[in-house]
Amino acid sequence: GGLNLAIEIAKSLLKNDSSFQGDIYDHPDLHFSFPSFASIKDDENVYSEWLSFLKENTFGDYQKWSSYIGNTVSQGSIKVSEIEKVQKKSSLKSYLGGNKVFIFWGAETMMPQTSNKLLKILEEPPVNTYFILITSNIQAILPTIISRCQISNLSPINKKVRETLAKRST
């Protein structure tokens, strides 16, 4: 449910962009970072696959994402190169002139050097820029990152409720 909550928060933060009428996943000021796999290359195609995964899997998890993208061998992680892209995008003016939202799904997969690079952004975030980190293992997040975040703990949604909600969203 963490990703669903993050998307709802993003909708709220981006709602003043009345010029945008499309699907929230296609909003030009909403950016996702997620674990990538060494066995899967093409970055641009992977982002499109990620958006398709989100639309098809309301309550997708790490294993479903790994399987969806066709990974069979490597452990996924959010890479330093991804944080470098976030640094660049976050330093630019928002596309529609309002807020920018960056959602990090699977934040626990960041290696220490990746976390340290993200920490630099979190220490002095650009104006009107919001970062939402989602993790299933908060102990895997650097304490210095945690200290810069507002924490919301969510209990797992039981399978029956998850299935009902997934049916309603399609």
What are these model-derived regions, one by one?
Residues G1-I24, V127-Y130, T135-T170:
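Charged, glycine-rich active-site and insertion segments that engage polyanionic ligands
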Residues G1-Q113:
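Clamp-loader machinery-focused feature within the broader ASCE/P-loop NTPase space
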Residues T109, E124, A140:
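Residues immediately C-terminal
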